[in-house]
Amino acid sequence: MREEELNRHADRLERAMNRVRESWNRERNPGKTRYLVSEALTTSQEINRAMMRGRLHPEVQKQWFIVRSELNRLAEAFEVPKVRW
């Protein structure tokens, strides 16, 4: 996966997480937020696959590890599948 593609996926993930935050802050509806979290995690799977396949700078991999860990905490909270290693 090229850097441009990875950046597009990162932008999609950022937008998805913004929707999660906005929905939760506005409505506090666990069902709707669970759905939005699930969508965000689906997007994050694309990034994760690229990170696992590609030879990326160690700092990029370290940052993704941190983000992925936080996403998985969110997945646990909303009882949706985690981003797999």
Name each region found by the language model:
Residues E3-D11, G31-L41, P58-R68:
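Short, charged, amphipathic alpha-helical segments
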Residues M1-S23:
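Alpha-helical segments in soluble extracytoplasmic regions
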Residues R19-R34, A50-Q61:
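Short, solvent-exposed, charged loop/turn and helix-capping segments
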Residues T42-W85:
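C-terminal amphipathic alpha-helix
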